[in-house]
């Protein structure tokens, strides 16, 4: 699926990606000499508020080994950005214990549906069961009152 490319936004993402990699100790420049690398990093750090100039920095100074990784990271970030705009494509995550996940997974397989669909089904069943239980309790109370009078 193709997503619209937003130059300013993506340049900011690229700058953040490169700075994070640099802070993590990875070589983000193509230079072997540390003084050249330090000068290039200093130039990159100055570009924080000028995101579109990051493209020129990438072309002139970035390590070739990082090129593909940067493209993949930006593509993934773009996908998450656009999917987050729509309620139905926005993803949420939850932490489950393994045994809970296993039970849910087995139930989803029995129902022939996804984990999300299984959760939705189980919640609606629990709600229906709760309403029925409340109705039975109410009927018992009414019957008790009727018999005691």
From Swiss-Prot:
Function, as annotated: Required for spatial organization of the terminus region of the chromosome (Ter macrodomain) during the cell cycle. Prevents early segregation of duplicated Ter macrodomains during cell division. Binds specifically to matS, which is a 13 bp signature motif repeated within the Ter macrodomain.
Keyword tags: Cell cycle, Cell division, Cytoplasm, DNA-binding
Example of a GO MF term: sequence-specific DNA binding
Organism of this sequence: Vibrio campbellii (strain ATCC BAA-1116)
GO cellular component, one term: cytoplasm
Protein name, entry field: Macrodomain Ter protein
Assembly and interaction partners: Homodimer.
Subcellular location field: Cytoplasm
Family as reported in the entry's similarity comment: Belongs to the MatP family.
Gene Ontology biological process terms in this record: cell division; regulation of DNA-templated transcription
Alphabetical list of NCBIfam families matching this protein: PRK05097.1
InterPro entries (UniProt xref): Arc_rbn_hlx_hlx, MatP, MatP_C, MatP_N, MatP_N_sf
């Amino acid at each position: 699926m193709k997503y619209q490319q937003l130059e300013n936004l993506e340049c900011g993402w690229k700058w953040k990606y490169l700075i994070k990699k640099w802070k993590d100790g990875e070589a983000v420049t193509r230079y072997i000499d540390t003084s050249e690398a330090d000068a290039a990093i200093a130039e990159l750090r100055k570009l924080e508020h000028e995101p579109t100039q990051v493209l020129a920095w990438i072309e002139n100074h970035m390590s070739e080994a990082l090129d593909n990784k940067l493209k993949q990271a930006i593509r993934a970030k773009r996908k998450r950005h656009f999917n987050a705009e729509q309620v139905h494509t926005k993803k949420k995550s939850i932490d489950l214990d393994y045994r809970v996940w296993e039970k849910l997974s087995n139930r989803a397989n029995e129902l022939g549906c996804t984990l999300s669909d299984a959760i939705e089904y189980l919640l609606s069943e629990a709600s229906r069961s709760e309403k029925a239980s409340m109705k039975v309790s109410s009927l018992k109370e009414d019957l008790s009152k009727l018999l005691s009078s």
